[in-house]
Swiss-Prot record:
It comes from Lachnoclostridium phytofermentans (strain ATCC 700394 / DSM 18823 / ISDg). The lineage of its organism: Bacteria, Bacillati, Bacillota, Clostridia, Lachnospirales. Belongs to the GatB/GatE family. GatB subfamily. SMART domains: GatB_Yqey (SM00845). Allows the formation of correctly charged Asn-tRNA(Asn) or Gln-tRNA(Gln) through the transamidation of misacylated Asp-tRNA(Asn) or Glu-tRNA(Gln) in organisms which lack either or both of asparaginyl-tRNA or glutaminyl-tRNA synthetases. The reaction takes place in the presence of glutamine and ATP through an activated phospho-Asp-tRNA(Asn) or phospho-Glu-tRNA(Gln). Heterotrimer of A, B and C subunits. GO terms for biological process: glutaminyl-tRNAGln biosynthesis via transamidation; translation. Its EC number is 6.3.5.-. This is Aspartyl/glutamyl-tRNA(Asn/Gln) amidotransferase subunit B. GO terms for molecular function: asparaginyl-tRNA synthase (glutamine-hydrolyzing) activity; ATP binding; glutaminyl-tRNA synthase (glutamine-hydrolyzing) activity. PANTHER family: GLUTAMYL-TRNA GLN AMIDOTRANSFERASE SUBUNIT B MITOCHONDRIAL AND PROKARYOTIC PET112-RELATED, GLUTAMYL-TRNA(GLN) AMIDOTRANSFERASE SUBUNIT B, MITOCHONDRIAL.
């Protein structure tokens, strides 16, 4: 029986977080009125000339440096020629011959095993528009707002062998880009899109099989399902003695299957030639040094620092730094209350629970560090217990309420008057004569029962140590 292995490479398109487009001053803001964020340059009108956005180049270099790439000191743009309704110029300005970054790598880890994935190249290009089908008029409309939005395309080597490795690679890539501030990587808004190049070969076979390209996956889960589906499809073809056709396929996640879109093109099919309206770029060592000097602390370094500086478990540090937003909330809160372990515990337990219940992503979390820190200080000062703190934290999570105001408004503060506690216990003892008798006869469980009844009567708003002390005193006199 033949044993096959899957060979996978990725082309990841990343929308850059610049304020304006790559060759004009139009906004890159997502959404908005149809065809409102475009100009004659975006639309490819005759006589218009592009002006390169410097920030795009800096973002591309920053990404390349973080992925251990060689930076091309003299690079240029090329025209990729093809016709499609969402491409008004009938060509895309991209980079083929001299991409800005080459020969990089990033390290992933799957099931405790580390592996280096090669980065073939990173190149800059402009995005195309968006086609919208109108079912009522039975026609397709074009929104050009996305035309000219700056992209980098990160092309991996075919080094991945499973869906698990692909997801680990994408998650690592996403974190690098988010920590750099290069992109928000929101797949639901199309700012991170991955095309899968997949082929099958027998284990030990040095030559690659015929590859197909998979498109239209809008989540990591969909990508994993698409890989598994295409892997099975190609193996079935080979087992039946058929050939795999080199083509581009569209994944339908609802039907859990893919459909052929078109034959897979090679570079020569696009008739690339140097972009005549943009001069070649020269990237100096001084500029590279400046960009490298602005590089923020990335996820791996931050995770190690959390373990060493804050003394939180490595697992917790990994989860917290696995979201840039969560890491930012953690550090901002710790800077206000100086309780890193407490902050970590609340993020790991209550925050994760509430995120799961609300089906919310950690990157969408809007948790006020000031309110979070205030809550921890209230617990530390003994002004509320942990049961009440959970209730208050849930309100901070949902509506970012001020914990002090919420506690006062709902009367949740701890009872500090020992007289009130004493009076409550006296009533409990009168109502539970049998338990008092049991305690007197050496049944220790009766004491715990009386403590529980007191806490219940006081809605958990009394200090347990104060309850224990007064209860023992009153029982000794009973």
């Amino acid at each position: 029986m033949k044993v096959y292995e899957t060979v996978i490479g990725l082309e990841v398109h990343v929308e850059l977080a610049t304020k304006s487009k790559i060759f004009c001053g139009c906004t890159t803001q997502f959404g908005g009125e149809v065809n409102a964020h475009c100009c004659p340059i975006c639309m490819g009108m005759p006589g218009t000339l592009p002006v390169l956005n410097k920030k795009v180049v800096e973002f591309a270099i920053a990404a390349g440096l973080a992925m251990n790439c060689d930076i091309t000191k003299n690079c240029k743009f090329d025209r990729k020629n093809y016709f499609y309704p969402d491409l008004p110029k009938a060509y895309q300005v991209s980079q083929l011959y001299l991409p800005i970054c080459r020969n990089g790598s990033i390290e992933i880890e799957v099931d405790g095993i580390k592996k280096s994935i090669g980065i073939h190249e990173i190149h800059m290009e402009e995005d195309a528009g968006k086609l919208v089908h109108d079912p009522w008029e039975d026609c397709t409309l074009v929104d050009y707002n996305r035309c000219g939005v700056p992209l980098i395309e990160i092309v991996s080597e075919p080094d991945m062998r499973s869906a698990e490795e692909v997801i680990a690679y994408l998650e690592k890539l996403k974190l690098i880009l988010q920590y750099l501030g290069v992109s928000d990587c929101k797949m639901q808004e199309g700012s991170l899109r991955a095309d899968i190049n997949l082929s099958i070969r027998e284990v030990g076979e040095p030559e690659f099989g015929t590859r197909t390209e998979m498109k239209n996956m809008n989540s990591f889960k969909a990508i994993a399902r698409a890989i598994e589906g295409e892997r099975k499809r190609q193996i079935e073809l080979l087992e039946d003695g058929k050939k795999v056709i080199q083509e581009t396929r569209r994944w339908d996640d609802n039907k859990d299957t893919s459909f052929a879109m078109r034959s897979k093109e090679d570079a020569q099919d696009y008739r690339y030639f140097p972009e005549p309206d943009l001069v070649p770029m020269e990237i100096s060592e001084e500029w590279l040094t400046e960009i490298k000097g602005r590089e923020p602390e990335l996820r791996d370094a931050k995770m190690l620092r959390y373990v060493k500086e804050y003394e939180i478990p490595e697992y917790d540090a990994g989860i917290i730094t696995g979201s840039k937003n969560l890491a930012d909330i953690f550090e901002a809160t710790v800077s206000l209350c100086n309780k890193p372990k407490e902050v970590s515990n609340w993020l790991m337990v209550e925050t994760m629970r509430l995120l799961k219940e609300s089906e919310q992503d950690a990157e969408e979390l809007k948790l006020s560090p000031a309110n979070f820190a205030s809550l921890i200080e209230l617990i530390d000062a003994g002004k509320i217990n942990r049961t009440i703190a959970k209730e208050v934290f849930e309100q901070i999570f949902k509506a970012n309420v001020d914990p002090n105001a919420y506690i006062e408004e709902h009367g949740l503060g701890m009872v500090s008057d020992d007289g009130v506690v004493r009076s409550t216990i006296e009533n409990i003892l009168k109502e539970n004569v049998q338990s008092v008798s049991d305690y007197k006869n050496g049944k220790d469980k009766a004491f715990g029962f009386l403590v529980g009844q007191t806490m219940k009567a006081m809605r958990g708003k009394a200090n347990p140590s104060v309850i224990n002390e007064i209860l023992r005193e009153l029982l000794s006199k009973a």
